Amino acid sequence: MGENNTPEQAYPASVADKDDIAAAKGEHVEEIGHAVTVEDHEQTVFQAIRTQPWAFAWCLYAIYVLILTSFDNQAGGTVIGIPQFRKDFGSFFEGDYVLPAKWQSAYSGAPVASAVIGSLGAGYVADRIGRKWTYFISYIFIFVGITLETISTTNEIFFAGKLIAGFPIGAFITVSMTYIGEVAPLALRGIMTAAAAIAFTIGPFIVSLVVNETGAREDRWAYRTIFVSQYGVSGLGALFLFFMPESPWWLVNKGKMQKAARSLARLGYDAVQVEKRISVIALTLAEVRKETEGASFAECFRKSNLRRTIISVAPLSIQALCGVFFVASYATYYQQIAGYTPKESFKLAIVQQVLSMLGNITAWFLIDRVGRRGLTLWGMCLLTVLLMITGGLAVAGTPGAVKGTVALLLVYCYIYNVTIGATAYSLLTEVATSRLRAKTAAMALALQNSLFTMWAFVIPFLFNPDQANLGAKVSFIFGGLSVLSTIYLWFYQPEVAGRSYEELDEMFIKKIPAREFKSHITEVQKSQRLPADDLGHAK
């Protein structure tokens, strides 16, 4: 199913040594690379889908894999809002059953903590054995985790299931985002990475539908149905894995030119295009090697890579700081505490996920037109205002204010997914240098999950009625962190929309200031005499 690590006689044979690719083909490779870059810029979204339908299809598969991660993440938070789950695993407190804060923290924190390990491990493993085999190993872990969650009757067994399921969750995200960044044509790259975020709304949407139908039951199937349904979602993904072509970028980097050619052919490129694409990949990797040698995690922090690492990692960390963990995990529980019936809160959960999906779909049409920087920056401004108003209404505490808080949390889901919820994944896959993309993605996701782990342990003690009982007033904390995040974005976030990896390499090596990225004329543009506006940059 995968590829071994033994280099073969390369395609073409004269460039078998991957460290001498650029030298062996010389100016010919560079000319082909620049020409293909210009062709990519001229291609529209619909042309890319029509000419490379299989590349588009396998990007969709990588997006589908992300549904597994969002499904399990949402299931862990949603079960807290199911009365029967609190009864089976919790204790009686002031007229209702409450899950102990320590176990609530453990259920939320354990899978996020193991996802950190999964993300970092996947970055290393994916570079050693390939993207496809890393997927395969992750599927084994996810099935074990689902089984333990389903059969559990004690907090300890359920905790074990959540812990094990966290490892593939981290791995799936790392590999999927890396694979999309490597396989998607330039015209589709922004849309596909933004569309990847919709997977993080589809999973919760499915969970909400299941809970709406079964959550009011008075037996264990009120919550077990959620986990059983995961078998279908995961099983379908595992079935299609056997047909997935390996990443041509990974194959070229390993010196497997013939296999890279076959992979590109399976992705929909004809014979002429295959040779051109291999030249582009080889040129890009060779130019990166001129700047640095090795592909260790430490390399992410050296020379121009450090700046790229920070810019790649920061948006995902900002996601974890701006309150999405609280909104995604505690909205249903908060609605019940605020006086809504379980059935009403389950219906509101469906509305929440529909708004999240609509927000992400909206981002597809804005991410290239508005640009990554603009959409992220102004989105954070809106989220900051929403969080501060939400906290203020929670302080008021009147019935009308409580309803207003619930409404604002729904609006938050839409705005978040239009902006930082979508752009963070585009920036992660686009900004990282080619040879370090998997490791950069691993670090970004590990840091994000570390922050989520912190919130998982802290929020129950701030939020729960038997603890600090802050409720939605925790929005003030996230609002303050959002202010700091917005300031960072204003000064340090560059615009990368419409830029090829070759152009980004050039601009980072030249240390172009962040706010000058949009207007900078690259050597590729100069050589082809194409103005910046002709390259499809965001206006």
Where do the PLM segments sit?
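Alpha-helical transmembrane bundle of multi-pass membrane proteins
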Residues: G2-Y269, A286-K539
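Short, well-structured alpha-helical segments
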Residues: A271-A286
